[in-house]
Design a protein with these regions (language model features):
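Short, glycine/acidic-enriched loop or turn micro-motifs at the edges of active sites
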Residues: 105, 170, 208, 213, ...
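C-lobe/activation-segment region of protein kinase-like
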Residues: 26, 198-203, 215-279
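Short beta-strand "wing" residues that participate in macromolecule-binding interfaces
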Residues: 45-46, 204
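Short, hydrophobic-biased segments on the C-terminal half of alpha helices
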Residues: 32-36, 193
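Conserved ATP-binding subdomain of kinase catalytic cores across diverse folds
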Residues: 29-30, 41, 45, 62-173, ...
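Short amphipathic alpha-helical interface segments
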Residues: 1-23
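Conserved kinase catalytic-core helix
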Residues: 19-21, 25-28, 131-153, 175-214, ...
Length: 279
């Protein structure tokens, strides 16, 4: 029933009862009874327009995606919620080792703002919040597959609808740790930015809030807004990423690196980063 409403939302903001009944192979009366039952559980929302319309929310969409991931064998169990942001909810999970499931929530914020900010969402019709989250998850998964393992990121495992599964990583956010060797950490971040650039990707939202540090290793997380290096604003977005990182290290650790010099290092594809930090 939930999948029938989901399918209908490709063409309708509020899916008509007859279409849901046809999709389920049930009569309208039985379909209406089940929809009202799901509505009481806050899995379906009902609206009386000039027809009776139904719509699912993110709770139902989470269940559909999770069921699909279990059926495919990607996930065998769901754990605690470990993070909530403006555009995602993150849970621990179990599968082939400890995992994380990131449920995208792009449509939960201003859809107009999200569509304007994300190139892969620009052509969506108004109100397609469900598919905004779906496309954001698939975009992030494709980017991670392109980067892994050359760039130090969590290993991508699977994607279903708006749910992205990846390996669970240890460590703390760069913003929260006190680094023993901040220069080495900055070098690793720049090296990974360089590798991503060589693979045709700019993070486009990089800061101390999406770099994880564990011992002498880092992992760069949160790639839904990443752009290709052929994007007309790629260089400006790369400069913004670099500004955020360099500003953090200058403020916290008094390590000063010129933005234009760092930009040349990341774009060079050579050994300029190593030479800079070995001086």
């Amino acid at each position: 029933m939930l999948r029938a409403v989901e399918a209908g939302m490709r063409d309708h903001e509020w899916v008509p009862l007859p279409e849901i009944a046809r999709s389920c192979g049930l009569g309208e009366r039985k379909s209406e009874f089940r929809l009202r039952s799901l509505s009481q559980k806050k899995l379906v929302f009902l609206e009386n327009l000039h027809y009776q319309g139904s719509q699912i929310g993110f709770n139902a969409y989470d269940l559909i995606a999770l069921a699909d991931l279990v059926e495919k064998g990607s996930v065998t169990g769901l754990g605690n919620r470990v993070g909530v942001g403006k555009e995602s909810v993150v849970y621990e999970a179990v599968g082939d080792g400890p995992l994380i499931i990131k449920f995208h929530r792009q449509g939960q914020t201003s859809f107009k703002h999200v569509r304007r900010a994300r190139d892969h969402l620009r052509d969506l019709p108004r109100g397609s919040w469900l598919y905004a989250a779906n496309l954001a998850a698939r975009h992030e998964f494709r980017v991670m597959e392109r980067l892994y393992p050359a760039v130090s990121i969590p290993r991508p495992v699977a994607c279903s609808r708006h749910a992205l599964v990846m390996e669970q990583i240890s460590g703390s956010l760069l913003q929260k740790v006190e680094l023993a060797d901040p220069g080495e950490c900055l070098e690793m971040i720049l090296m990974n930015m360089q590798k991503a650039f060589q693979l045709g990707i700019v993070h486009a939202d990089l800061s101390e809030f999406n770099v994880m540090v564990a011992g002498d290793e880092i992992k760069i997380i949160d790639w839904p807004q990443a752009v290709d290096t052929t994007h007309p604003n790629a260089v400006e977005l790369l400069k913004r990423d670099l500004h955020n990182i360099l500003e953090f290290f200058a403020r916290r650790y008094r390590i000063k690196t010129e933005l234009e010099e760092a930009l040349e290092m990341v774009r060079s594809g050579g050994d300029l980063i190593l030479e800079h930090f070995r001086r």
